[in-house]
Amino acid sequence: MKCEHCTRKECSKKTKTDDQENVSADAPSPAQENGEKGEFHKLADAKIFLSDCLACDSCMTAEEGVQLSQQNAKDFFRVLNLNKKCDTSKHKVLVVSVCPQSLPYFAAKFNLSVTDASRRLCGFLKSLGVHYVFDTTIAADFSILESQKEFVRRYRQHSEEERTLPMLTSACPGWVRYAERVLGRPITAHLCTAKSPQQVMGSLVKDYFARQQNLSPEKIFHVIVAPCYDKKLEALQESLPPALHGSRGADCVLTSGEIAQIMEQGDLSVRDAAVDTLFGDLKEDKVTRHDGASSDGHLAHIFRHAAKELFNEDVEEVTYRALRNKDFQEVTLEKNGEVVLRFAAAYGFRNIQNMILKLKKGKFPFHFVEVLACAGGCLNGRGQAQTPDGHADKALLRQMEGIYADIPVRRPESSAHVQELYQEWLEGINSPKAREVLHTTYQSQERGTHSLDIKW
């Protein structure tokens, strides 16, 4: 992605040299952890990544930079080793939550089926000293269900006076950070308030699971395994609601690639193990996913729900139509010859920028957009889908897409466990506690209007 018209004179990346763009494996730079790496683009006389602009000094505090550098395997092993050395009263309960988009990577990496890859990963982590391994799909259930309700509400309230649409997804931390730090209130007002799956998983582990185990949140060290580096930054910003003790939902985020490096250096002959669930001794034998080609599936599930709730239309197959490119696609619902729902998927910052420009000009006809920072979606996260020299690994991505497509799809509404948790944990589907735990607010910190003049 090229940015040839940036006017950010204060950007510290202008003095950056090519040598400074290299980073160590232990401390990935914020520049490598945000958005598309793609091609270099020019800012004055310096070569920088587009992602540098999105995580420059104006966006990241010194404290965040230090904390981000600690989000690595060393921190994970620090806790594992402390558990082996210190008194049992000081032990941490280690919980690892794995994103479903990471599993195709492990399946491709070790030439296994996705189910066997899940069991191999779980068995390996437990051989290191991890106590519980969870799948974050249940957290995505909550995120999608809350997003469905919010979209229907916004659609019904939308008018010329109260422009609540389009609703833009908020599950991608790279996109959300860009919206908050660069685009500001005109765009953050359109962000869905439902928390991301990672944020919901933090509450599930540190609140619900902790109480089930009679543990304080501080006794749990929660690790997220995710396909992209932006999740590390999300972990720094996410705190549980004050009523839930105010601790961080995720203590450490490791990318799929970082976990694979640990596995390659360890003993892979360990016994496989089934993934744990939040419900006692019950194990998760089957790997399932939501209906998205390479994402958590917000678009498809919200589209079906809205079609039924608003127009009493049952949609079984969601049909995508490519518009500008394969990363900008459209889904529509027609009734009596009129388009009544128009959804889009916008992946990658080039498509995001085009979307924003049209939205600000009032020429954006969509009711809902699934927005992801990475071209190709979550499977193409730079924490797993890249070559050793830092470029996108297209062959690996195609392989992962095939594996992911073969995973059985489940609808969030069909999960009895989710309905149980709404009642047992959140005191009802539309309760004040559900609102507090499952929704968030956004902080607009615009740095200047010139940001929208950038051409990608």
From Swiss-Prot:
Molecular functions (GO terms): lamin binding
Where does the record place the region Disordered?
1-36
Tissue specificity of this protein: Ubiquitous. Predominantly expressed in skeletal muscle, heart and brain.
- Which InterPro entries does the entry mention? Cytosolic_Fe-S_CAF, Fe_hydrogenase, Fe_hydrogenase_lsu_C, Fe_hydrogenase_ssu
Question: Where along the chain is composition biased (Basic and acidic residues)?
Answer: 1-19
The answer to whether the entry has keyword Phosphoprotein is yes
Q: What is its main location?
A: nucleus
The transmembrane segments are none
- Modification type Phosphoserine: residues: 29
Pfam families assigned to the protein according to its UniProt record, in alphabetical order: Fe_hyd_lg_C, Fe_hyd_SSU
Q: Which GO terms describe its cellular component?
A: lamin filament; nuclear lamina; nuclear lumen; nucleolus; nucleoplasm
Organism domain of life: Eukaryota
Q: Where in the cell is it found?
A: Nucleus
The alphabetical list of record keywords is: Nucleus, Phosphoprotein
Q: Does the keyword Phosphoprotein apply?
A: yes
What is the similarity comment for this entry?
Belongs to the NARF family.
Subunit field text: Interacts with LMNA and binds to the farnesylated C-terminal domain.
- Please report the name of this protein according to its UniProt entry: Nuclear prelamin A recognition factor
